[in-house]
Amino acid sequence: MPIFDTCEKNRGRLNRPISCSNGENKIMPEFEIFEEATPRAPMPTGGNLAVMNINMYEEINRLAHHTDAYKISKLIIRRGQEFIMGIVFNRRFDLKTDLFVIEFLIGKNPIPTQKTLISVTPGENKQTSNWGVRVVETINTETKLGITPAADCIVGLYNTYVTVITNAGKQRSQRNPTTDFYVLFNPWAQKDQVYLKNEEERQEYVLNDVGMIYNGDYNNIGSRPWNYGQFQSGILEACIFILDFGKMPLQYRDDAIKVVRKASAMINSLDDDGVLEGSWSDDFMLGTAPTAWTGSVEILNQYYSERGVPVKFAQCWVYAGVFNTFLRCLGLPARVITNYCSAHDNNGNLQTNIVLDEDGSLDTQVSDTIWNFHCWNEVFLKRHDIPENFSGWQVVDSTPQEISEARLLPLWSCICGSHP
């Protein structure tokens, strides 16, 4: 039985399950007969077209999409940018007489209206999706295509099928995991929600896999190196797993705001068995002391391998470091911020209340607190839910502090962000 249950059924007109797991997929039938007898074009000379092989051109595509550093044996591309795909047929493809459809699926219940089933057809001026396709060249029996995912498509792992339209029905290629590919957010694409204009900033906030996290206090600023390791083996799979384990519907994973907000809840374990369990005591016998961590890779790989058991223990800089890895891994420009003399609002009134008793001593029972330092994250994205001038660097905090209402989560959860 899969670890993830399908989300509750849609109670609207569709009345079908909503897929919340990228780890499950639908195996499409190899042949579908046409339900109605309708006029068909004559069979092309040489017989029906048949798919012999699909080439994802991983090396050239990953270089072009700035994903060559990921240690994973699958194609990884960024949305809103063309990638090359080759289809080897049993004979030379003829654009005038042959017809085939490329299908990209994500999740167990793919449907076009939720952008989980994408169909593109070479030669058609009007596509059924916002994905683009063009014939680059045909050499012998291989046809190379340029495919451009929509700049607002779902981020995650897609399955690939090629379906040839024949007089009898649809002949589909077999399920082949080697043609699966990941789509990430794209800070290089102007139409993407996370577009970042400056190349130096893209290199630093997306591609840099190490950094310094500042700590200490205002009069004695310290720092510790942190290995974000967003390209290391298993990390991309772990980041997708985090969204799956949090039961985030696939149809919402096209929106950077929703992905960031969901992830800010899933990095802490307080109410959803997220990645890290916090501890501000001096007893770390049941886990690892927060000061002992030097990077995110071990934490995320442990959480992924143990299928959602929170890793012990964390404090603010550990939460921020791991969250930074998650964001950069999925293509979101992100950085860790340290704030000194950091006021903590205990009751949500957006004020810092310092209460003294009659002797002038601090009343810790009713006072808000001021921490020596606190770490959070900033992520660069365009806000479509508030006025455009608030777009840019947004504050997101995965350290569990106070409850926050969220559209994507049941009832109340410990999450924070995005805030301009």
Language model regions located:
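Contiguous beta-strand segments within globular domains
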Residues: 56-106, 142-146
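Secondary-structure boundary elements
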Residues: 191-335, 345
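Hydrophobic/aromatic-rich core segments of domains that either
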Residues: 296-420
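Short, compositionally biased P/S/T/A/G/V-rich stretches that sit at domain boundaries
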Residues: 2-82
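Eukaryotic intrinsically disordered and solvent-exposed regulatory patches
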Residues: 70-74, 88-89, 132, 145-149, ...
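Nucleo/cytoplasmic regulatory scaffolds in medium-to-very-large eukaryotic proteins
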Residues: 2-11, 16-26, 77, 107-112, ...
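Extended acidic/polar, glycine-enriched regions
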Residues: 94-213
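Conserved beta-strand elements of beta-rich interaction domains across eukaryotes
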Residues: 90-94, 107-109, 165-167, 188-190, ...
